[in-house]
Structures are given as structure tokens and as C-alpha cells.
Amino acid sequence: MKIIATNKKAFSDYIILETYEAGIELRGTEVKSLRESGANFKDSFCRIKNGEVFLLNLNIPQYRNGSLNNHDPERPRRLLLHKKEIHRLLGKVKEQGLTIIPTKIYFNNRGLVKVEIAVAKGKKKYDKREDIKKREINRRIREYLKG
């Protein structure tokens, strides 16, 4: 498994409740661009529309060697999930405060592009501060035990 990009901000801004692996519908130049330069998760999220899951605002830069038929960098991309998973996601999103966010995009062992999406709940400011305090305490304990 070769990781292309991870959404580091998702882990600091959200509490991850459940993760799913989804295929993603891409054009040829998008796959080439992912192999070459990666992707940007800034402000990306998932929406369920007409029984299909779409990944919005994922920026895959245009392929450098592409022609006029190059792709739009921020076009909506369909995620490939089983119907049962889509219904489960729909039920979770209808709960108050839950959202679907992408956490990782990678090539699996067979060379296919996969996206790891997560059902998450947004953190409040005090939750973020608490996490920072815990990390700082753990770091100090490790330093103290080390010597």
C-alpha cells in the first residue's frame, strides 16, 4: 500500500468514529497526476446525493504532460461503495453533528486508487486544547523516563 496523501487536519479537527475504504472514479490524467504529485485535502468532504457518495473539494493538480483533455482539479468525484455501506453512512449523517470526511488516499496492493473515509464529529475548541495538553504531558513523561 502506497499512501499518496493523508488529511492531518481531520485528526485534529474531528473525532473519528468509523472508517470505510472506498474506490474512487477517476479519469486517466487524474491517476497519472496522483502518481506524480499527490493530492490536497484542504476543505474536502463527502456528500450523499441520489444514493451515491461524492467527494467534493479534493484537489488533484492537473497532469503536467496532459493535453487539452486534462481534468478539472476540483471536480466532484464519485466514491464506489456497496449499497449497504451507503445506507449505513446515510443513517449516521442524519444523526446530529456527524459528517463524512476523507482521511487518506492511497494505491492498494493491486495498484487501484482507494480513499479512506470516516464518519466524524467536529471537535469543540476546548476538546482541541485538551488534546494538546495530553500530548504535552505524554511528551514530558517520555522525556523524564528517557533520562
From Swiss-Prot:
- Report which superkingdom the organism of origin falls in: Bacteria
The record's Gene3D superfamilies line, in alphabetical order, gives: 2.40.280.10
Q: Name one GO cellular component term.
A: cytosol
> What UniProt keywords are attached to this protein's entry?
Cytoplasm, RNA-binding
A Pfam entry, by short name: SmpB
Localization recorded for this chain is:
Cytoplasm
Any GO BP: trans-translation
Q: What is its main location?
A: cytoplasm
Citing just one GO molecular function, the answer is:
RNA binding
- State the protein's purpose: Required for rescue of stalled ribosomes mediated by trans-translation. Binds to transfer-messenger RNA (tmRNA), required for stable association of tmRNA with ribosomes. tmRNA and SmpB together mimic tRNA shape, replacing the anticodon stem-loop with SmpB. tmRNA is encoded by the ssrA gene; the 2 termini fold to resemble tRNA(Ala) and it encodes a 'tag peptide', a short internal open reading frame. During trans-translation Ala-aminoacylated tmRNA acts like a tRNA, entering the A-site of stalled ribosomes, displacing the stalled mRNA.
Stored NCBIfam families: PRK05422.1 (NF003843), smpB (TIGR00086)
**PANTHER family referenced in this protein's UniProt entry, alphabetically:** SSRA-BINDING PROTEIN (PTHR30308:SF2), TMRNA-BINDING COMPONENT OF TRANS-TRANSLATION TAGGING COMPLEX (PTHR30308)
- Annotated family: Belongs to the SmpB family.
Know the name of this protein?
SsrA-binding protein
- Write down the species: Thermosipho melanesiensis (strain DSM 12029 / CIP 104789 / BI429)
Taxonomic lineage per UniProt?
Bacteria, Thermotogati, Thermotogota, Thermotogae, Thermotogales
What gene does the UniProt entry assign to this protein? smpB
